[in-house]
Amino acid sequence: MDQEIFIIGLNHRTADVEVREKFALTGCTSLEPAVIPLGNGISEVIILSTCNRVEIMVAGRGDDVPDTVLSLWANARGQHPEELRPYVYIHRGLAAVEHLFTVASSLDSMVLGEPQILGQLKDAYRDAVARNTTRVILNRMMHKAFSVAKRVRTETAVASSAVSISYAAVELAKRIFGEMNEYKAMLIGAGEMAELAATHLLNCGVNKIYVANRTFERGLELAKQFDGEAILFEELFTRLPEVDIVISSTGAQQAVIRAKDIRDVLKRRKNRPMFFIDIAVPRDIDPDVNNLDNVYLYDIDDLKEVVEENLSHRREEAAKAKAIVRSETEVFGRWLRSLDLQPTIVDMYSRSTEIAQEELLKTLRRIGPVDESTQKALEAMLNAVVKKIHHEPICFLKRRYEEEDSGQRYIDFARRMFNLDNEPEQPEAHKNRKRPQPDLPAGCPGKTIL
């Protein structure tokens, strides 16, 4: 194959956040024509740029492609290539394909199994297609990457369990209550953790979200994001009987909720169960609350145990996912190698079609004019014959080429056998001379040729 796949990139493992910011390409959404132009050995390009990685996927010719990309990338950010080089990795050929499949399956993410990377890859591909910078190779590779990612999520549990504190908190609530659409939740505090928890609660279908925050305006802002209701912090215990799930993350120096407060709340709730999740440090909720009947209290240490247990489970599932990635990389590699066959297959069909057309014209001259429908029927018949004659030889070529390292020998033999390169015929004097046996590839029919 005259073209090769390269991936040139950096990520959260090879570069800290300052370096990633310096060389990010998010400002030019995948690429503008001036950043990584086609040409100079580059025939296809896609750029993925996120907060945790920049990866430039290229199909091109020549050993200098990575250096060309590196220079263009650095120049686009107003930096010298040597400033970028220490942080960059380069994958080539099937190693590049396997790397992409690994990334798409979220096996290379900072949080193993997180789903965002697949969407980011799809956005990068969509942008490249819109800019007309992809062709057969990268198009096929990206679609295969999406298929591999789907297979990994379907056949493994690599993304099935909570690995963030906020997500784990909501997952615990779901275990207690089951379906969440009949239950109401209250967030005490309106910081980042509360915002993440609200997102997960909403995704789980919780009936309503209340937000209690010392700064009412901030609570109101968060509540509006999730179609919830902000309440004054002073009204906290007045409104608590209405809710079933409480997630607290105020960062206060003393407990915000004490056991005696919850006893009164439970009486007003007629002892219906309540679920408290304290993700604040120092803790917002007095641990004695957990001694009350029909109350479930978890603090951040409990959640960390859940997260670590789930991460361990994800790591086990990642081993299965990597086996899928390796298998699919081999499949893609066979397709990639089969591209070498395409010119020969096209030439075989072209030569046979040309001969068929010549013979059709001879026949028509001999039998005289025919009507248009008859001529179309004859042409369709000849095309069908050409396809059927070539079906078995082409299947044979593909099988041998995929299965054996010496695939080029089969291409060479097919080209000689069908004289696709228009080599001159043997002179008349040599026609009756016994020919030496050609060095046919193993498995070819007709080992003896007179």
From Swiss-Prot:
Pfam families: GlutR_dimer, GlutR_N, Shikimate_DH
InterPro entries in the cross-refs: 4pyrrol_synth_GluRdtase, 4pyrrol_synth_GluRdtase_dimer, 4pyrrol_synth_GluRdtase_N, GluRdtase_CS, GluRdtase_dimer_dom_sf, GluRdtase_N_sf, NAD(P)-bd_dom_sf, Shikm_DH/Glu-tRNA_Rdtase
Catalysis: reaction(s): (S)-4-amino-5-oxopentanoate + tRNA(Glu) + NADP(+) = L-glutamyl-tRNA(Glu) + NADPH + H(+)
Gene Ontology terms, MF aspect: glutamyl-tRNA reductase activity; NADP binding
UniProt pathway: Porphyrin-containing compound metabolism; protoporphyrin-IX biosynthesis; 5-aminolevulinate from L-glutamyl-tRNA(Glu): step 1/2
Binding positions (NADP(+)): G189, A190, G191, E192, M193, A194
Functional note: Catalyzes the NADPH-dependent reduction of glutamyl-tRNA(Glu) to glutamate 1-semialdehyde (GSA).
Complex and partners: Homodimer.
Protein name per its UniProtKB record: Glutamyl-tRNA reductase
